[in-house]
Swiss-Prot record:
<dbReference type="InterPro" id="IPR020826">
    <property type="entry name" value="Transketolase_BS"/>
</dbReference>
<feature type="binding site">
    <location>
        <position position="291"/>
    </location>
    <ligand>
        <name>thiamine diphosphate</name>
    </ligand>
</feature>
<dbReference type="GO" id="GO:0000287">
    <property type="term" value="F:magnesium ion binding"/>
</dbReference>
<dbReference type="GO" id="GO:0016114">
    <property type="term" value="P:terpenoid biosynthetic process"/>
</dbReference>
<dbReference type="InterPro" id="IPR033248">
    <property type="entry name" value="Transketolase_C"/>
</dbReference>
<comment type="similarity">
    <text>Belongs to the transketolase family. DXPS subfamily.</text>
</comment>
<keyword id="KW-0414">Isoprene biosynthesis</keyword>
<dbReference type="Pfam" id="PF13292">
    <property type="entry name" value="DXP_synthase_N"/>
</dbReference>
<dbReference type="GO" id="GO:0030976">
    <property type="term" value="F:thiamine pyrophosphate binding"/>
</dbReference>
<feature type="binding site">
    <location>
        <position position="373"/>
    </location>
    <ligand>
        <name>thiamine diphosphate</name>
    </ligand>
</feature>
<dbReference type="GO" id="GO:0052865">
    <property type="term" value="P:1-deoxy-D-xylulose 5-phosphate biosynthetic process"/>
</dbReference>
<dbReference type="InterPro" id="IPR029061">
    <property type="entry name" value="THDP-binding"/>
</dbReference>
<feature type="binding site">
    <location>
        <position position="182"/>
    </location>
    <ligand>
        <name>thiamine diphosphate</name>
    </ligand>
</feature>
<comment type="pathway">
    <text>Metabolic intermediate biosynthesis; 1-deoxy-D-xylulose 5-phosphate biosynthesis; 1-deoxy-D-xylulose 5-phosphate from D-glyceraldehyde 3-phosphate and pyruvate: step 1/1.</text>
</comment>
<dbReference type="GO" id="GO:0019288">
    <property type="term" value="P:isopentenyl diphosphate biosynthetic process, methylerythritol 4-phosphate pathway"/>
</dbReference>
<keyword id="KW-0479">Metal-binding</keyword>
<feature type="binding site">
    <location>
        <begin position="120"/>
        <end position="122"/>
    </location>
    <ligand>
        <name>thiamine diphosphate</name>
    </ligand>
</feature>
Length: 638
């Protein structure tokens, strides 16, 4: 807990109603307390950091002027919402963020009535807010709906689908879009749109031009003078800022204004509250504002572990096991040296996907397409048609956004694209929106796909090399964090497609492990004298080995860190069924529910796919394994 006596104003705020009881003149002091409180709290707990510091003033202004939760705020992405959570009844719990049974790291409707829309992925806010505004309009509600979007989210196509719809509606929706322009996603924001918005940042000319035009026009809208003034205004606006992009889509554009100047923010929002129809307010903010170290290293302070704010982040001393992301990072540089056709694509995840080194060593072969997963996948498809060897480095959860392109543009054409899928399976503290628990199911059903899941770091490297050499679409899906710590070498050795590895020869029951579950399965198998197989390939399965094991064993247990429905275990059952083989099966995996936020270890234990859970499930199904050495267990299996 934090001593709130050092925050005399903030300690009096439990809800936005309390905030609105303060005089407007005190808002700047409240913002300063909120920023200090956030720094102290995240220092104790860890969590998303720099993005929240950048929206302190905006958060205070919005909750002060709008009658939340009647008026509705929709936050894009959501990693900037810790200040919002502090002002909406969760101040004294914010130190539990990301912890089991603690505050969620992103807006979550089940957690608070002030969290109007669940989020974690980018670029959804305008669509959701427009839907709310339309529903309110149909119900006769006069509520206001505000979408706050930024952190690189304006690069995704979904944003422009929503803007296009909102700007062309009749009657016009009561919608305000706030563009929080901080030049960042997690890494630096990239692309032509970012450059265009950047040109607006220094322009104070636009508003002078617009206001001058209004004074000349007065109430005249359609006479020759008015038409001339509008043409003159548009000509000069186009020379200075991108407002015409939004205004041509039907939005009234205001800005850019300083997002850390509370009086200016309050004044602009008060004006916008009097206007009808779709509005767009462009604010310029600094990610990490108010904490010098975060302002200087916005990427490093995007998300942090617990740290001492007086010292900043301190690198941990001593050698550490490489993460799977580190393994990919080294492999992709080694493969690029050996394969000149290799190109790498990432949707705004250079740091998270381990591509910093590659981007520096091979800048002409590195393509950060910004938050644009659909484009990333089809870009790779286009490259592959010309003989390139593209690798799409992407998180499992974000690949969901490019699934149609994976099917329609890559798999149907059987193109040579490798998907390096990080954060597969149980991810942990970021919760349901960032979990990778569906990928084996949605990849396994795609024709022509080869799907691999490594049991350790060395195997991950071999599978990546296998995927590059394979003629067709391939995916290597690996978990967050470290593996068992096996030795690595610099070779680019490959694996035979569709061949499993026998880890331990036993009797009676065969444990078939996929990916990160193999080590736990092997420990159980050795203890109970059971056969253990590292399946390696989710598709194609090692048919020959499975049929041979079916002849000599009385039951199969499949283990995966993916939902059971449609997953790797389902593939084993389908194979046996096609061969008219009937035998007892036990499928262990993730349940038919979305993951909550907790540590990876807690979630694996809850799902029963850690060592203790696997052992308990096997003995519950075949209790004779504790005492009996008899191989015939079919009767006991029921």
């Amino acid at each position: 807990m934090i001593d709130t006596t050092r925050y005399p104003r903030l300690s009096r705020i439990q809800t936005p109603d309390d905030l609105r009881r303060f005089d407007e003149a005190e808002l700047t002091a409240i913002a300063e307390e909120l920023r200090s409180y956030l720094i102290e709290s995240v220092g104790k707990s860890g969590g998303h950091f720099a993005a929240g510091l950048g929206v302190i003033e905006l958060t205070v202004a919005l909750h002060y002027l709008y009658q939340t939760p009647v008026d509705q705020l929709v936050w894009d992405v959501g990693h900037q919402t810790y200040p919002h959570k502090i002002l909406t009844g969760r101040r004294d719990q914010i130190h539990t963020v990301k912890q089991k049974d603690g505050v969620a790291p992103f807006p979550k409707r089940e957690e608070s009535i002030y969290d109007t829309f669940g989020v974690g992925h980018s670029s959804t806010s305008i669509s959701a807010a427009l839907g709310m505004a339309i529903a309110a309009q149909r119900n006769g509600d006069d509520r206001k709906v505000v979408a706050v979007i930024g952190d690189g989210a304006m690069t995704a196509g979904m944003v422009y689908e929503a803007l296009n719809h909102a700007g062309g509606m009749d009657p016009e929706p009561n919608l305000l879009v706030i563009l929080n322009d901080n030049r960042m996603s997690i890494s630096e924001a990239v692309g032509g749109l970012t450059k265009m918005l950047g040109r607006a940042s220094g322009s104070r000319t636009l508003n002078a031009i617009r206001e001058g035009g209004k004074k000349i026009l007065g109430d005249k809208k359609n006479n020759p003078t008015a038409r001339f003034v509008r043409r003159w205004e548009e000509h000069w606006k186009g020379m200075f800022v991108p407002s015409t992009l939004f205004e041509e889509m039907g939005f009234h554009y205001t800005g850019p204004i300083d997002g850390h100047d509370l009086p200016s923010l309050v004044g602009a929002l008060k004006t916008l509250q009097t206007l009808k129809g779709p509005q767009l307010l462009h604010v310029i903010t600094t990610k990490g504002k108010g904490y010098e170290l975060a302002e200087g290293d916005q990427i490093g302070y995007h998300a942090v572990g617990p740290f001492d704010p007086s010292k900043g982040l301190v690198a941990k001393a001593g050698a550490k096991k490489p993460t799977y992301t580190d393994v990919f990072s080294d492999w992709v540089c080694d493969m690029a040296a050996a394969e000149p056709k290799l190109l790498v694509i990432t949707p705004a995840m250079r740091e998270g996907s381990g591509l910093v080194r590659f981007s520096k060593e091979y800048p002409q072969r590195y393509f950060d397409v910004a938050i644009a997963e659909q484009h990333a996948v089809t870009l790779a498809a286009g490259m592959a048609t010309q003989g390139a060897k593209p690798v799409v480095a992407i998180y499992s959860t974000f690949l969901q956004r490019g699934y149609d392109q994976l099917v329609h543009d890559v798999a149907v054409q059987q193109l040579d694209v490798l998907f390096a899928i990080d954060r597969g399976g149980v991810v942990g503290p970021d919760g349901a929106t960032h979990a990778g628990n569906l990928d084996l199911s949605f990849l396994r059903c795609v024709p022509h796909m080869v799907v691999m899941a490594p049991a350790d770091e060395a195997e991950c490297r071999q599978m990546l090399s296998t995927g590059v050499q394979y003629q067709g679409p391939a995916a290597v899906r690996y978990p967050r964090g470290t593996g068992p710590g096996v030795a690595l070498d610099a070779s680019l050795a490959t694996l035979p497609i569709g061949k499993a590895q026998l880890r331990h020869s036993g009797t009676r029951i065969a444990l078939l492990g996929f990916g990160a579950t193999v080590d736990a399965a092997e420990a159980v198998g050795r203890e109970l004298g059971l056969t253990v197989v590292n399946m390696r390939f989710v598709k194609p399965l090692d048919k020959a080995m499975l049929l041979e094991l079916a002849k000599t064993h009385d039951g199969f247990v499949t283990i995966e860190d993916n939902v059971v429905a449609g997953g790797a275990g389902a593939g084993v059952s389908e194979l046996l069924n096609a061969e008219a083989i009937t035998m007892p099966m036990l499928h262990l995996g993730l349940p038919d529910s979305f993951q909550h936020h907790a540590s990876r270890e807690d979630l694996l234990a809850e799902a029963g796919i850690d060592q203790a859970g696997i052992r308990a499930a096997v003995l519950k199904r075949w209790p004779q394994l504790m005492t009996s050495k008899t191989p015939a267990l079919n009767a006991a299996a029921g």
